[in-house]
């Protein structure tokens, strides 16, 4: 008898736990619902779906990922049971094989969302951002893990101090170009926040990057690097860099490496601060790169000359 009562009590508590998950249903965007479930497995949540007000008096049939329910799920307003990570795309139709009317994508996000598996976590985090100058345009990129190479971006949100920043997703889905309307001469008071929502099947993960523009400004490679009189090297400021150059100054790092070595080689000969060398250039590679003189942000990529 006690065993039976214990089993009944467990069943009641399990049902209560499942019903309590209703509060974790959030709308991410039109036609996309996010179900936040605990990290531990075993969750079961009833999710209400509506085909649409225009179909109130229609004989609506539902499908999940293109497959009809058995027995059929009918009605303009229905409830579906989502177990663990088994979300999907729920579509409504005029008949079992009839016209498509509407859909709701149910995605699952673990709560807390700290077990990320979709994007690679490299040096500096999952998202890497850079800007060529202070005009407000910046680009952020990411890399999917090998096992989640089919993952797709659902939504990108960028904002600064409650003001939305427009962004456009790259064609390959591995980056985004954003444009913030910022005066180049104005000191930044608030950070930019970028959140990328990306899904693999029904699993949703959110990745956030927060930064000041001055932290990610990386000058372009220095153009027109050339040698004069055999030992004097000259170059120009990048065309994309801010003007006047007296206000947006650059400082330079200069390096000589053995011929055949990369500018990133640790086998450097010397690091110097003038532009004249007294050695035979053909035996060495002259490398130079730049960074913002005042913020000391990221260095540009190396330019080189032999």
Each model region followed by its residue ranges:
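Solvent-exposed loop segments of extracellular immunoglobulin-like
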Residues: 53-64, 138, 149-159, 245-260
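Conserved aromatic anchor
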Residues: 136-148, 229-248
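Short beta-strand segments within Ig-like beta-sandwich modules, predominantly Fibronectin type-III
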Residues: 64-76, 167-177, 262-272
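N-terminal Sec-dependent signal peptide, specifically the hydrophobic helical h-region
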Residues: 1-35, 52-63, 89-91, 98
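Extracellular fibronectin type III
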Residues: 101-111, 201-217, 291-306
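Solenoidal tandem-repeat scaffolds enriched in leucines and small polar residues
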Residues: 119-190, 198-202
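Beta-strand-rich modules
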Residues: 85-99, 181-207, 274-298
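Proline/serine/threonine-rich low-complexity linkers at boundaries of modular beta-sandwich domains
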Residues: 14-30, 108-121, 210-220
């Amino acid at each position: 008898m006690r065993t039976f009562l214990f089993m009944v009590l467990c069943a009641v508590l399990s049902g209560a736990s499942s019903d309590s998950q209703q509060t974790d249903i959030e709308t991410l965007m039109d036609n996309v619902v996010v179900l936040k479930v605990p990290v531990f497995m075993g969750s079961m949540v009833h999710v209400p779906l509506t085909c649409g007000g225009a179909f109130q008096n229609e004989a609506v049939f539902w499908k999940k990922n293109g497959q009809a329910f058995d027995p059929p799920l009918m009605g303009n307003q229905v409830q579906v049971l989502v177990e663990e990570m088994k979300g999907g795309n729920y579509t409504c139709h005029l008949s079992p094989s009839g016209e498509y009317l509407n859909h709701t994508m149910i995605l699952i996000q673990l709560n807390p969302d700290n077990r990320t598996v979709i994007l690679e976590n490299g040096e500096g985090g999952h998202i890497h951002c850079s800007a060529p100058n202070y005009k407000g345009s910046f680009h952020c990129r990411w890399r999917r893990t090998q096992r989640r190479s089919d993952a797709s971006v659902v939504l990108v949100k960028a904002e600064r101090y409650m003001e939305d920043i427009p962004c456009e997703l790259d064609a390959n889905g591995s980056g985004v170009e954003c444009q913030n309307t910022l005066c180049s001469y104005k000191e930044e008071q608030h950070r930019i926040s970028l959140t990328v929502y990306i899904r693999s099947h029904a699993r949703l993960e959110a990745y956030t990057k927060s930064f000041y523009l001055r932290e990610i400004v990386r000058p372009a490679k220095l153009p027109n690097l050339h040698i004069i009189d055999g030992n004097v090297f000259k170059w120009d400021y990048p065309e994309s860099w801010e003007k006047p150059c007296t206000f947006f100054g650059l400082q330079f790092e200069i390096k000589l490496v053995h011929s055949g070595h990369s500018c990133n080689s640790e086998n450097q000969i010397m690091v110097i601060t003038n532009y004249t060398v007294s050695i035979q250039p053909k035996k060495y590679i002259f490398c130079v790169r730049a960074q913002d003189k005042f913020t000391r942000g990221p260095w540009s990529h190396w330019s080189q000359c032999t």
